Amino acid sequence: MEKEIKYLPIINRSDSCKVKVSDICYITRDDRKLLFDTEYGLKTTYGKMNTVERYLGPEFVRCMSGCIVNLSKVRETKNMIVYFENGKELKLGRTGYVRLKQRFNAYLRKMPPWDDKKDDTNRNEDTDNDGH
């Protein structure tokens, strides 16, 4: 991975802008176009997924060759659909969905209370010698 950046430049014929990386929900590919679905709407530019992926943080997961999802924007995964916090939905194929679900579950396990490594020792300290 290259250096993480805060903004991605989006340049096309009709407009140019910078998109805050943390505002991206997901990125899909349509032929040679990259479609950035953000908190503020859809932005498109020409480019390659591999090029963009190098600059994204660890919360971004490439679940298929043509799709990158920002796990920090995902609210829930269910029935092969990814539900985002802002109400957007993304339907995935089986392979992509399984890959994303595994990574999302691992992402969730890093959040409190599951991330607390002391949890096991605290649980042992909470019980007396009789195991109660």
Predicted segments — roles?
Residues 1-85, 89-91, 132:
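Conserved binding/recognition cores within well-folded domains
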